[in-house]
Swiss-Prot record:
Gene: rnfB
Gene3D superfamilies: 3.30.70.20, Electron transport complex subunit B, putative Fe-S cluster (1.10.15.40)
InterPro entries per the UniProt record, alphabetical: 4Fe-4S_dom, 4Fe4S_Fe-S-bd, 4Fe4S_Fe_S_CS, Elect_transpt_cplx_RnfB/RsxB, RnfB/RsxB_Proteobac, RnfB_subfamily
UniProt-recorded name of the protein: Ion-translocating oxidoreductase complex subunit B
Subunit architecture: The complex is composed of six subunits: RnfA, RnfB, RnfC, RnfD, RnfE and RnfG.
Family, as annotated: Belongs to the 4Fe4S bacterial-type ferredoxin family. RnfB subfamily.
Cited NCBIfam families: PRK05113.1, rnfB
C-alpha cells in the first residue's frame, strides 16, 4: 500500500469517528424547546388574556423570540417591556397604542343576577372565579388579572370590570432620590 492510500484511509477513519461522536452528542445533549422563548415567557404576566393578538403568553413569547415587537402586552405594561428590552438587548418601545396601558381592573360579579352557569369559570385563565353550577359565583380579587375574558361568555351580563382602588398594598410609592443621585437640573428644581 502506498503512503497516500494509508493517509486517506486514516483521515476517513478519523472523519467517521468524529461524525459518530458529533451525532451522539447531538442526540444526547439536545435542547428541548427554545431557551430564549422560555426566558421571555417567564417575564410575561401569564394572564393568557390574548390582548397581544396571540392566544396566550407562551405563543407571544415564541413570536417575540422570532422577531415580533415587545410592546403588545397591556397587562404587563411598561415594566414588562423594559424587562424584555433588557433581556433581548433592544430599545424599549412605548406600549402599543392599540392595546394601550389601562388602569388595573378586576372582574366584579353582581351575585344577585348570577344564574350559576359556570361559563365565566371556564373562561377564566387563572382560576380567579369560584362557584358551583346553579350557585352564585364570586371573584377572588387577589387572583384576578383583569383580562376581561369572563365578561363575554356571561349570558346574563352580570360581570363588570371595575378599576382597582388604591390601598396600602397597591399604591405605588415614589422613592425619593438621594442628593448624590440627582442630576444638575434636578438639584436646581429641588432647591
Amino acid at each position: 500500500m502506498s503512503a497516500v492510500l494509508i493517509a486517506v484511509l486514516a483521515l476517513l477513519a478519523l472523519c467517521l469517528l468524529g461524525g459518530a461522536i458529533l451525532g451522539f452528542a447531538a442526540v444526547r445533549f439536545r435542547v428541548e424547546g427554545d431557551p430564549i422563548a422560555e426566558q421571555i415567557n417567564a417575564l410575561l404576566p401569564q394572564t393568557q388574556c390574548g390582548q397581544c393578538g396571540y392566544p396566550g403568553c407562551k405563543p407571544y413569547a415564541e413570536a417575540i423570540a422570532g422577531g415580533d415587537k415587545i410592546n403588545k402586552c397591556p397587562p404587563g405594561g411598561e415594566a414588562t417591556i423594559q424587562a424584555l428590552a433588557d433581556l433581548l438587548d433592544v430599545e424599549p418601545e412605548p406600549l402599543d397604542a392599540e392595546g394601550g396601558e389601562k388602569p388595573q381592573m378586576v372582574a366584579y360579579i353582581r351575585e344577585a343576577e348570577c344564574i350559576g352557569c359556570t361559563k365565566c369559570i371556564q373562561a377564566c385563565p387563572v382560576d380567579a372565579i369560584v362557584g358551583a353550577a346553579r350557585q352564585m359565583h364570586t371573584v377572588i380579587i387577589s387572583e384576578c388579572t383583569g383580562c376581561d375574558l369572563c365578561v363575554e361568555p356571561c349570558p346574563v351580563d352580570c360581570i363588570d370590570m371595575i378599576e382597582v382602588g388604591s390601598n396600602l398594598q397597591s399604591w405605588k410609592w415614589n422613592r425619593p432620590l438621594a442628593p448624590g443621585q440627582l442630576i444638575a437640573t434636578d438639584r436646581e428644581q429641588a432647591a
